[in-house]
Amino acid sequence: MSARNAASARTVACLLGPTASGKTAAALALAARRPIEIVSVDSALVYRGMDIGTAKPTRDERAAVPHHLIDIVDPADAYSAAEFRADALRLVAQIAARGRTPLLAGGTMLYYRALTQGLNDLPAADPDVRATLDADAARDGWPALHARLAGIDPATAARLAPNDSQRIQRALEVYLLTGQPMSALLAAPPRDDDAAAGLRFVPVALEPSERAVLHARIAARFDAMLEAGFIDEVERLRRRDDLHLGLPSMRCVGYRQAWEYLDGCTDYRTMRDKGIFATRQLCKRQLTWLRAMPERIVVDCCAPDATVRAVDALERVLDGRAPA
């Protein structure tokens, strides 16, 4: 965005951070001071019936402050970054038209990147191609498909773990549909599109000064989810004939581990440990994305007054007092 366009653009405050960094508390604290509406930037919160394992805002919290892009998709269906971008831009405009302030809040950095930087020419998901790849994985295993990917797109394969089924499948799907490696398509300039041209997104990032503190929070939160009935929630989902571990919804952190426990593949303690480890790995990826944003305003989420600091940073953004 040019300096002239930036000066005339409407500022949109964004509250980003890894799992368990205190985003919900900060967003609700800001809502006590300003007439905001929260637009979720979270790929897990879109799914209905997945409340405990996603740490979804409670009914009381959602009644107190309008929330958007929560409970909008059935777990049997997919929801893409392109759909998120279109929905978020529409909501930002509608909220502003009502005389209220939109606040984007969440930790799905792929969504945030799609929103702020536009979309590359990646094809939509193809159910037939995915079914074929799922069948191949069931027969040969995901490490074998990872090796297949390494032969056609070594750059993408190098950044994926051999058991990262969701991303391996997507990279192979893109190649099968386009004949081009995903890494090449992502390296191309995003499509020109003026849908967000009048907006200036300013990220406030909750990041830990001590990773051990965040890890302790993650463990405590996972234990609290288990106490709140997370296993029962997954059991209800597992009883549905149309849900399986290959779906994006069931790849959400914690759900796969609980499902495998219910299948008898692991014991309870192993399930808990794997769920916490997977959440920590997600946190690591989220922080990697955040630290690649030089424009972000960092708030230490380990500080005792982190919520107050985050609200102050967001208010400076909204009042035009943040660095341009």
Curated annotation (Swiss-Prot):
Binding-site residues for substrate, renumbered to this chain: 19-24
Signal peptide from the UniProt entry: none
Catalyses which reaction(s): adenosine(37) in tRNA + dimethylallyl diphosphate = N(6)-dimethylallyladenosine(37) in tRNA + diphosphate
Entry-linked Pfam families: IPPT (PF01715)
InterPro entries assigned: Dimethylallyltransferase (IPR039657), IPT (IPR018022), P-loop_NTPase (IPR027417)
A single BP term in Gene Ontology: tRNA modification
Gene3D superfamilies: 1.10.20.140, P-loop containing nucleotide triphosphate hydrolases
Cofactors: Mg(2+)
Residues at the site labelled Interaction with substrate tRNA: 108, 130
Keyword field: ATP-binding, Magnesium, Nucleotide-binding, Transferase, tRNA processing
GO MF terms held by the record: ATP binding; tRNA dimethylallyltransferase activity
EC assignment: 2.5.1.75
HAMAP family: IPP_trans (MF_00185)
Protein function: Catalyzes the transfer of a dimethylallyl group onto the adenine at position 37 in tRNAs that read codons beginning with uridine, leading to the formation of N6-(dimethylallyl)adenosine (i(6)A).
The protein, known as: tRNA dimethylallyltransferase
Organism (species): Burkholderia pseudomallei (strain 668)
Taxonomic lineage: Bacteria, Pseudomonadati, Pseudomonadota, Betaproteobacteria, Burkholderiales
